[in-house]
């Protein structure tokens, strides 16, 4: 994609995580319970992807490894529709709570 000189170019990113994985619930919803909770991420991403397709918009989707492991078809669709895929770590752990080794392990786990 090329842009004319002096044109406005915007960046758009999406955090691909489920409702129970947002920071507001950290300390309220235990990570060990995630498997038993109602999953909405695929349905919500479908809606976002459709809106972006309708508007001919591309974005970067920052995806949790936890979500990627459970929804590989969703990640393939994101890429197939021309969006960029990026890592948001394994399970949304805040980097300032991790030491260097834990951070490296989290990124490596998410990469796989």
Which residue ranges define each predicted feature?
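Catalytic alpha-helical scaffold of carbohydrate-active enzymes acting on polysaccharides/glycoconjugates
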Residues: 1-112
